[in-house]
Amino acid sequence: MRNRILAVLGIIIVYRFMAHIPVPLAQPTQLKQAMNQVLTQNAFGGFLNLLSGGALVSMAIMLVGLSPYITASVVMQMLTKAIPRMEEMSQDGESGRRRINQWTRLLAFPLAILQSIAYIMILRSNLLSGTSVASSMTSTQWLLSVSAMTAGSMIAMWMGEIITEKGIGNGITLMIVVGILSQLPQTLGTIWKAMTTVNGKPFHVFNWFQINGLNHMVTWTVIILAIVSLLILYALVKVNEGQRIINVNYAKRVHGNSQYGGVTSIIPIKLITAGVIPVIFAVAFLALPAFAGQLMVATKWHSDLGRNLILWFQRGSATSGAVTGWAALIYPVSYFLLVIIFTYFYTSIVFNSREIADSLQKQGGFIEQIRPGKQTEKYLKHVVNRLTLFGSIALGLIAVMPFVAEYILSDFGMGTMASSMSIGGTGLIIIVTGALDCIRQLNSRALMVSYDEYK
């Protein structure tokens, strides 16, 4: 167990170190100054910086990150449901799953190359236009930059799989969690900057002590939001840990002088069987239209359509709503619907009612008042669908709540802090679900080993 934890920590340290190795576009200081200017003026760039775990601000080789692997996973899982041969392969035990995983890796490689080229084109033409970085790029720098970013993406994918196989928890989710947590100091700094002001008054804390130079309205807003965030965190943990227990009885069997069976076991069905994957898939899927729009504008190919895609799929807020009207609602509404769709989709992959029903029938198990076989399969599907309906709606509501907070805060002139809250909402779901998954696996592994092995 100790070796697993140390292996995970070592991989995470290397991953965060690589997130600060710049691509060979220009001098590192020149790149960082240009990207800092970009992130203060471009909302899309700020969102990409979050998803890359801060790699964008340094133009690091980990800029593309896990995005190609996530996209390839979504494509392969959709093909698994659409193509009967692949569905049979996915049900063919460990060997079938290994072949599908290998195809996913092979698909991620060309996607990483394409995304690396697209990122550089977008950054060069849109985000870094007017800077010396955009005008001094040679063909050699193009080749080296694309190669470095593709290699970084493949290394990140390999690290995630190593954590999954040799470590604790889901490696891809854990690396995304680490990337989001790395942005926490910057988010807290933004909130503190919004709270402090030159003409601020002393803020008394229960008459115990006072903090000078605070804007009272912003401070009370932050306190209220902190309380609301804790309540959302509590609700998220409850929803994630909620489950339905189905009792399974086993018929008695006599073999010689021995009697088998006659016992009762349970099938725990979680409220959100899919875990955090629907949120990750929804965020990755929603980033594609804006990404494509930026690429179209950069290449001047159907620029009007590209600008519309950027407009329609930017993160909605009260500030953008004043400019774009109904278009500001497209992102949060699409986000809510995609979370529900991907929750159902991934649940159908993770929880196979037919396999469970067949396994129970072969072992002589049955659910009370439900006949084995087809009736058991139908009953399990009914229970899972009802739980998934409630769980997906709850997860979707939690996901879009920060957008409501952003809308309210923007009315008080706190748009910058509101943007941080909106990004933090997606991050909160990923962090909580990923942490609970790690804790669950730690507990299960701790029960499987002796004291000497645990040490």
What are these regions (language model features)?
Residues 1-88, 95-455:
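N-terminal cationic and glycine-rich segments that engage phosphates or anionic surfaces
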